[in-house]
């Protein structure tokens, strides 16, 4: 048989679930030219790019589609988009089909999605996780922790909570989905009838609570985290990311999901 390292479930041209050749590689030079009698011509999967918005709502071929490209705002217009994001979850609570698109979302604050999820399901997401946070001088300054806590650790663990839901949810990801963008994936992994479509995420979830600080003598900015976080299988997924359920070149993922819904009669 063919190795699972290269053969993955995907969505075919007609919308049927089938198999295709996908692999993780830095530049493709380490990939085989043939497998099991198949001659292979590898193509690089590309991210879709952020675009000129942080959150948008639309319908794609009759399917409600939410696009989250960044969870931070630089302008009043973007702030309004994020406020809409946080407040609209309840409007999608009963839709039978939903596409949630976090392709090329590099992160920001996960608060916006947490509030959306609460409106959507009636509860906050609780993925299986274990986190540790060291109370450093910088952390105490930034987060107003008491000085007497400095040098100690706060460690917490929770088993996770499953959310039952009858409607189908499709999450779109690409290699530029990272940090808070990956939190969306981890949270939606707790929801019944959710499928992730695309490719591996960027792998940027080990170190939470990142801040920009400035060196005292040069004024140079540095950006780093103040804790450690492990999720689901408790493996470090940095640089590897989280794999999709169905592998599709990210620019084609939206159309592929619509084809699949049509092929299997999921629109009702």
Question: What is each model feature region?
Answer:
Residues 158-162, 239-268:
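Extracytoplasmic/peripheral linker and loop segments enriched in polar/acidic and small residues
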Residues 81-85, 155-156, 180-181:
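Amphipathic coiled-coil/heptad-repeat helices and related helical stalk/stem segments
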Residues 106-168, 207-214, 226-230, 236-238:
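Gly/Ser/Thr-rich loop/hinge elements
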Residues 196-254:
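BRCT (BRCA1 C-terminal) domain core and associated BRCT-interaction motifs
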Residues 168-190, 195-203:
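Extended C-terminal subregions enriched in glycine
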Residues 73-79, 146-149, 173-174:
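Short, flexible loop segments at the rims of nucleotide/cofactor-binding pockets, characterized by
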Residues 1-98, 102-128, 168, 211-216, ...:
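Flexible, low-complexity junctional segments that flank or bridge functional domains
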């Amino acid at each position: 048989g063919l190795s699972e390292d290269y053969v993955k479930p995907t969505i075919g041209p007609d919308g049927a679930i089938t198999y295709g050749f996908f692999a993780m590689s830095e530049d493709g030079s380490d990939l085989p030219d043939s497998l099991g009698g198949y001659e292979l011509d590898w193509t690089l999967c590309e991210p879709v790019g952020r675009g000129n918005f942080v959150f948008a709502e639309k319908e794609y071929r009759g399917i409600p589609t939410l696009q989250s490209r960044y969870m931070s705002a630089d302008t009043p217009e973007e702030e309004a988009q994020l406020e809409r994001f946080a407040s609209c979850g309840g409007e999608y609570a009963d839709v039978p089909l939903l596409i949630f698109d976090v392709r090329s979302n590099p992160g920001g604050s996960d608060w916006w999605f947490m509030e959306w999820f609460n409106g959507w399901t009636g509860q906050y997401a609780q993925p299986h996780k274990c986190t540790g946070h060291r109370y450093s001088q910088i952390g105490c300054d930034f987060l107003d922790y008491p000085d007497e806590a400095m040098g100690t650790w706060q460690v917490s663990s929770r088993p996770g909570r499953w959310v039952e839901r009858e409607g189908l949810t499709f999450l779109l990801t690409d290699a530029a989905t990272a940090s808070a963008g990956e939190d969306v994936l981890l949270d939606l992994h707790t929801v019944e009838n959710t499928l992730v479509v695309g490719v591996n995420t960027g792998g940027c979830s080990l170190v939470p609570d990142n801040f920009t600080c400035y060196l005292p003598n040069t004024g140079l900015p540095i950006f780093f985290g103040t804790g450690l976080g492990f999720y689901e299988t408790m493996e470090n997924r940095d640089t590897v990311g989280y794999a999709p359920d169905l592998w599709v070149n990210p620019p084609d993922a939206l159309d592929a999901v619509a084809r699949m819904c049509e092929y299997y009669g999921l629109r009702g």
